[in-house]
Amino acid sequence: MPRVKRGTKRSDRRKKILKRASGYFLTKSKLYQAAQEAVERGLKFAYSGRKQKKRQFRSLWIVRIGAAAKLNGMSYSQFVHGLKVAGIELDRKVLSDIATNDAAGFTALAEQAKAALANQPAA
């Protein structure tokens, strides 16, 4: 069986890892094994971070909508329920954008939600 020295395969793989680790502190950017562990750990955090980002943005939207609803004399849950009863189908991202950039528009939505809740029969 012939001897395999791995020439460029090994060096290319190592260079790729060390390039990804550039900017890391001390040995994590210089030594292959430490760099490999640091890069793998970083990739794990990046993967989970992409999932957390979605949750955090949804939470931010809800906080913004809740604050704007409070200014209009409603709680977040009352506001969202009122919109649902009124048949207004806007997602939280859009509602948050309206709340931050168009206060008059949000107030109009809040009034519609209040009217829908007032007209709703008591269950």
Curated annotation (Swiss-Prot):
GO terms for MF: rRNA binding; structural constituent of ribosome
Gene3D superfamilies in alphabetical order: 6.10.160.10, Ribosomal protein L20 (1.10.1900.20)
Entry keyword Ribonucleoprotein: yes
Keyword Ribosomal protein carried by entry: yes
Highest taxon above the source species: Bacteria
Keywords recorded for this protein, A-Z: Ribonucleoprotein, Ribosomal protein, RNA-binding, rRNA-binding
Cellular component terms (Gene Ontology): ribonucleoprotein complex; ribosome
Summary of the function given for this chain in its UniProt record: Binds directly to 23S ribosomal RNA and is necessary for the in vitro assembly process of the 50S ribosomal subunit. It is not involved in the protein synthesizing functions of that subunit.
Protein name: Large ribosomal subunit protein bL20
Originating gene: rplT
